[in-house]
Regions:
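Short, solvent-exposed coil/turn segments at beta-strand boundaries
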Residues: 3-4, 14, 283-286, 291-300, ...
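A short acidic/small-residue loop/turn micro-motif
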Residues: 119-120, 147-148, 184-185
């Protein structure tokens, strides 16, 4: 990168290849400090210290979206809470003419990084990731953009064979830069200096998704009228309506964990995403991830999200809805029964998750899929044993299958 940080083609949170800072390379102490110290060091390129610190318009017309999913979803290979909104199109969007669903820059700035997943992942259809710097303190990331439009098209014209373009294309607030993805949705993230959270162990993100501490709620950065319009499309009404990804509580089981000595968020990059017989993505960098946190819509329910439970990433709730913040260092091992769940409307009617309603609820099922034993240790680590097919009552103590997780 321009800041002297080595890059490597890594797998991102969607199981796609992309370029990111690589901790496996020779990183100096200064570069390591930079990687956790500023957005410009993370995203690279030039930035304007005096540029916008807030958005001045939206990323598109809210009337074009069916609904918006807030920050914090944990879903299959997205084991830890995701750092982006999902902007869902109507189900007939693939039948609309090109140009029907435009994506715009939310403030003045410059496109500094574009990745072409068609080249990087050998996909048969166009799919782009765009990074926009609005200032040294405000960045926008858009993923699964189906076509680059206007000035942004220059990046595609100049795209290297490796699928990663770096440069500087000035854009204005409201300028159309993309068209509807051929997928059902696109991802939208905001990263801001004033949103930075002091993580328990920020170095766990140095090797992958090093922007995580700067994850902002995009609704906090729009003009009031845009925020109001976007909130109306949100499937969550609990405040903050835009959700959050930050659930770590030191000294408890709640939050995000990684198997010790597996390179933090980046995980074991030798594992490529494959499809299991059940159709789920299995065996990826997320194998070593664990998150125990509130659901992103039904926030009263705690989700136990694991990257490798019997060979695939899964999310469960627990019998009794055990609150992980009550499991603290110094206590005895806790063992919970893991339950699959379905979805209902707020009044208890069955609901299709692909046609969600506001404030839907999780409905735990009765069949026990297995159990999870865990104990928070005095040094801040956690001993964890995943027990597919075994209920909590059968636990007699940790076995050789137990692993140590760290923040």
């Amino acid at each position: 990168s321009p800041e002297g940080l080595p890059l490597k083609c890594l797998m991102n949170s969607a199981g796609e290849l992309m370029w990111d800072v690589w901790a496996g390379g020779q990183i100096s102490g200064e570069a390591k400090e930079n990687a956790t110290g500023s957005l410009n060091a993370i995203f690279g390129g030039e930035c304007d210290a005096n540029g916008p610190k807030k958005y001045t318009t939206g990323v598109g017309d809210e009337n074009n979206w069916d609904y918006i999913v807030p920050l914090g979803e944990m879903n299959f290979g997205h084991v830890t809470p995701v750092d982006h909104f999902y902007m869902y199109y109507p189900k007939d969007a693939d039948q609309r003419a090109p140009g029907s669903f435009s994506i715009t820059s939310p403030a003045d700035g410059a496109i500094i990084d574009v990745q072409d997943f068609r080249k990087m992942n050998n996909w048969p259809y166009p799919d782009f990731r765009i990074v926009i710097t609005h200032s040294c303190d405000l960045y926008t990331v858009l993923i699964h953009i189906g076509a680059l439009v206007g000035a942004a098209a220059r990046a595609e014209a100049e795209m290297p064979a490796d699928g990663h373009w770096v440069g500087n294309i000035p854009v204005k607030a409201g300028e159309i830069i993309g068209d509807r993805s051929q997928a059902e949705k696109f991802d939208f993230s905001t990263f801001a200096t004033d949103a930075k959270v002091d993580l328990i162990n920020p170095l766990s993100y140095l090797a992958g998704e090093s922007w995580k501490p700067y994850t902002a709620n995009p609704l906090d950065y729009f003009p009031a009228d845009v925020t109001k319009a976007y909130e109306a499309k949100m499937i969550r009404t609990t405040k903050p309506v835009g959700g959050t990804i930050f659930y770590d509580i030191d000294g408890t089981a709640q939050g995000v964990w990684f198997v010790k000595d597996t390179n933090g968020y980046a995980g074991l990059q030798g594992q490529r995403s494959v499809r299991s017989e059940t159709g789920f993505n299995s065996r990826g960098y997320w194998d070593t991830h664990l998150a125990i946190a509130p659901h992103h819509v039904d926030t009263a329910m705690f989700v136990y999200s694991m990257g490798d439970f019997g060979g695939q990433p899964v999310q469960f709730v627990t019998k009794g809805n055990i609150d992980p913040s009550t499991v603290k260092a110094g206590g005895a091992p806790v063992v919970v029964d893991l339950l699959p769940f379905k979805y209902t409307t707020p009044d208890g009617q069955a609901m299709d998750i692909f046609s969600p309603v506001k404030d839907y609820k999780l409905a735990p099922q009765t069949d026990i899929a297995g159990s999870l034993a865990f104990q928070v240790n005095a040094d801040g680590s956690m001993t964890v044993e995943k027990r597919p097919g075994k209920d909590a009552a059968s636990f007699t103590g940790f076995s050789a299958d137990a692993l140590t997780y760290v923040r």
